[in-house]
Regions:
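Low-complexity, intrinsically disordered P/S/T-rich segments
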Residues: 1-160
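P-loop NTPase motor-domain active sites and their immediate coupling elements
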Residues: 4-9, 74, 105-139, 144-152, ...
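Short hinge/gating elements
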Residues: 18-31, 66-74, 158-167, 209-217, ...
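Residue-level signature of catalytic and energy-coupling elements of molecular machines
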Residues: 22, 39-42, 46, 87, ...
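The conserved Walker
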Residues: 102, 167-168, 322
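P-loop NTPase switch/communication element
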Residues: 156-159, 183-228, 333-334
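Conserved lysine of the Walker
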Residues: 171
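Hydrophobic positions on the alpha1 helix immediately C-terminal to the Walker A/P-loop
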Residues: 174, 178
Length: 387
């Protein structure tokens, strides 16, 4: 396959792929009248159960429409949340998600799935204003939020991400969008990848990509070794930063670029003169954690927890996904050390609480519909994933 390349990156022998190779989606006309009509039905359905409301506004997104409602005086918010099944029945919707209240507003949000969903293409996100503003090499495309804005996620500030969702909910498409974003935006000198794919079918397409530190790992036992290597590399980088007197990878690389790093006299283990190298970011992607936990649970958990606790400062970041969000896969230690979560549709309320520590993921409609819970946020953001 021949891939069209763009111009050479300044100061690098590499050229980034041309944005033209990514598919763009067709423009989609919004049916505002149909959305308004459903808003009227929504108010009537609530009034039939004795809850008087006023429709403040509505936001039409690619997957759902959010109706913002103010309730009458003396009406408890819990009255509305208890009527979710009745609301879904009145609107002939598969399910609805209720935000009571919308964070920062004196209104209740009711999210109703659109009759026709809009396709969100990765090419659209990477061509957006938000992508052009992105400066960090680990900012990746995720999708569009409920207001239609492109969402770029900075994995460096997360600094690690835990993804969970049922089979077919869109986890692998999301991971592919993230990896493709790295390949489209950065050169191998800046970001390196370790891809762990026990399912054997998702990561094979990246074989031979220059960003890879090793071929995609499909054997769960070898995957445990790859994670252990990442731990050793983290420790080596801390040793280098300690000797050079820098707190993190940003300060070290800036000093390297300025030419401020002077290696001490002497030879390394191979008899070569000691030198300092620029440290690339390393992104470790695990596409199915449950398979690894079945084979080497203790080793895998130890490596993931050590990386999650310490690796941020030296530029090593984790993206860990599983289709089985149970406590024997997403253990308490792993959850405690990876505060950023991305939840796709799950089968039950219990699964939603394992991944998000709150309800909501059981109300998602699948096919890339997700909730992003940032490391310092208590209210998840609803996003339609890019494809």
């Amino acid at each position: 396959m021949i891939i069209q390349l763009g111009e050479l990156v300044a100061g690098s022998p590499w050229a980034l792929p041309s944005p033209e190779i990514l598919t763009r989606s067709d423009t989609h006309d919004v049916d505002a009248k149909a959305a308004e009509a459903r808003g009227v039905i929504l108010q009537e359905a609530l009034a039939a159960h004795g809850v008087e409301t006023r429709l403040v506004d509505m936001t039409i997104g690619p997957t759902v429409t959010r109706y913002a409602l103010q309730v009458g005086e003396g009406v408890k918010v819990s009255r509305v949340t208890s009527l979710s099944k009745d609301i879904a029945y009145s609107l002939a919707a598969a399910d609805v998600r209720i935000l009571a209240p919308i964070p920062g507003r004196q209104a209740i949000g009711i999210e109703v799935p659109n009759e026709e969903r809009e396709v969100v293409a990765l090419g659209d996100i990477l061509a957006s204003v938000e992508a052009r503003k992105a400066r960090h090499p680990l900012e990746v495309a995720v999708g569009r939020d409920i207001s239609g804005r492109a969402v770029m996620l900075d994995l460096a500030t997360m600094p690690h991400l835990l993804i969970a969702g049922a089979t077919g909910a869109g986890k692998s498409s999301c991971i592919n969008a993230m990896v493709t974003s790295i390949l489209m935006r950065t050169t191998p000198e800046v970001v390196r990848l370790i891809l762990i794919d026990p399912k054997r079918v998702e990561m094979g397409q990246y074989e031979g990509v220059p960003h890879l530190l090793t071929a995609p790992v499909t054997d769960p036992k070898k995957a445990a070794n790859a994670l252990h290597w990442a731990v050793r590399e983290m420790e080596r980088r801390y040793d280098v930063l300690s000797v050079c007197g820098y707190r993190d990878i940003g300060g070290y690389n800036a000093a390297y670029d300025r030419g401020d790093l002077v290696p001490p006299p002497g030879l390394d283990e191979e008899g070569e003169l000691l030198t300092y190298d620029r440290l690339p970011f390393i992104l470790v992607v695990v596409d199915e954690l449950s398979d690894l936990m079945m084979v080497a649970a203790r080793d895998v958990e130890d490596s993931i927890c050590r990386l999650a606790q310490m690796a941020r400062a030296v530029g090593v970041h984790l993206v860990v996904a599983t289709q089985r969000p149970s406590v024997d896969v997403i253990t308490g230690l792993i959850k405690a050390n990876i505060p950023a979560r991305l939840a796709f549709a799950v089968a039950s309320l219990a699964d939603s609480r394992v991944i998000l520590d709150q309800q909501g993921a059981e109300r998602l409609v699948g096919m890339g519909d997700m909730l992003l819970l940032g490391p310092s946020s208590s209210a998840p953001q609803r996003i339609q994933g890019a494809w």
